[in-house]
Amino acid sequence: MPALPAALLALLLHVHLCRPAPVNGSKWSYIGPDGEKVWPKKYPFCGGVFQSPIDFHNDILHYDSALLPVELEGYNVSSEVKFLLTNNGHSVKMNLSSAMRIRNFSFQYSAAQLHLHWGNRNKQEGSEHTISGRHFAAELHIVHYNSEQYVDLKSAVDKPNGLAVLAILMEEGDFNPSFEKIFSHFQHVKYKGQEAIVPGFNVRDLLPERLDDYYRYEGSLTTPPCYPSVLWTVFRKPVEVSVGQLLALETTLYCTESDDPSPLKMVDNFRRVQEFDERMVSVSFQQDPAPGEGSPGMFVSRALGTKYPPPRFSSGLSISSTCNCHCSDNTWDLLTS
């Protein structure tokens, strides 16, 4: 896949970063007066180009035989290592060791954290990326930063080639003991600001069996400030978690603090899919499509243009009205706080 020209991305980042950034304490949510429709007013990148998530459908897919299986290094973490699990008011986030790395990318990327996006108990459509319009129950993001060029996540988050995220789609199925190593601690992080210690485990077990079967494209953070600095690798086959595990995800957590007189459930914390003009998605597979992907056949790619029309929110898509979290945090707290 042709990489996003570094000079172009650097120019885009420079133009926006010359504008005053929102101060700490700016609010954002998924609906309501601070919802995603008004994100661009406070966070200009959210109304810009190369935005994520997107829908994967055949007319934007291009088979790339040069794509190699994702290789993991250091993902089997000793139980003596402790991960910090945090409710940051937008999601539940677990810090990871920088000794965890991914290979077969243009740069070396080291792990920083993972977090989840999900729906609600009445409508389990919580993934951010979709396949031919199909949502999955939830989505796990494992966030890595370019450790060849930057010292940490904070310094890489707004830079060209700064981040690489592995996205794992999740669907209802069998009980998943690996995800339970995280989910079993939810009672200790029910409210915003609460933390828990999770013993190390084999994080590889959170990923699908095949690491050579994925979509790849240049995109952005899916939360404010939406920097277009992410190389996305979205695995095609979802992993299974049980009904009970999904319910724990959808019913246990709050986006408010424990003493808030009006507690708000943390549900529907996913961004709607964005327009995908003048870009291509490279795929590592040519076999029959996964369920919901459409008919098999040759993938067609759009030419990568040099002009980028203003992005539009996809029509016909709605965000559930049950989520109304308004949080006063750092502008990119889902990644760094």
Task: Put a short name on every predicted segment.
Residues M1-S337:
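Alpha-carbonic anhydrase
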